[in-house]
Amino acid sequence: MPPVPVRRLLSVAVAGFSGLLGLGLIFGAYTAGPGVRVPFAVVVFGVQLLFVFAWTMAVRPPALPVVAAVAVVVAGAADAAAALPRIAALGPLGYVAAAGFVVGVLGQLVRRKDRARVTDSLGATLLIVVGVVAFASLVVLSRIPIGTQASHVCLAATAVALAVARLTDAVLPWPRMAPQVPRGAAGVVAG
């Protein structure tokens, strides 16, 4: 198998996107006040849609429409479960994740095509459902008095780490971890 070429501009674009995404989430968290949670939930829902799109395109599950539809519905339900209750808790998010997985299983059972790869599709559904529910936990965290500050620190650290890793890949894409991976070990370690 020939080595995959290093795409430096793609690494720079991913670094810029991760930085902008981190800034968007940080500034979105500022919109959440003591009684105002919906604006931040809308920002998080936008990020969840990007997450669903990126992962369904990367994983390419056999039942892509079912997986994507379940994930988008779970994202909306998770945001509602995070923003609407009077007391901030993670319990409702767990129920939403479990219900989303059950709906994903039922969606797979009614399909006749591609049942041979049902475990791949269920694995992708579980991965994406847990991911969108994890993003909704930011809304729950913003409802706790010190949670907003904690989320700012975590989001800033994540955005900086991703940007540094990808910018390092653009400048120093070596030593290669494997010929099929267009990233260098320096970027993985620096990030």
What do these predicted ranges mean?
Residues 1-49:
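N-terminal signal-anchor module of multipass membrane proteins
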Residues 1-11, 23, 170-191:
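C-terminal transmembrane helix-loop-helix hairpin of multi-pass membrane proteins
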Residues 27-47, 86-102, 144-160:
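Structural signature of hydrophobic alpha-helical transmembrane segments
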Residues 21-32, 55, 73-87, 104-109, ...:
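Hydrophobic alpha-helical transmembrane segments and adjacent interfacial helices
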Residues 140-187:
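Functional transmembrane core segments of multi-pass inner-membrane proteins
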Residues 43-85:
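Glycine/small-residue-rich interface belts in oligomeric ring/scaffold proteins
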Residues 62-73, 92-95, 116-128, 177-188:
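Cytoplasmic-side transmembrane-helix entry/capping segments in multi-pass membrane proteins
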Residues 48-62, 103-118, 163-178:
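C-terminal ends of transmembrane helices
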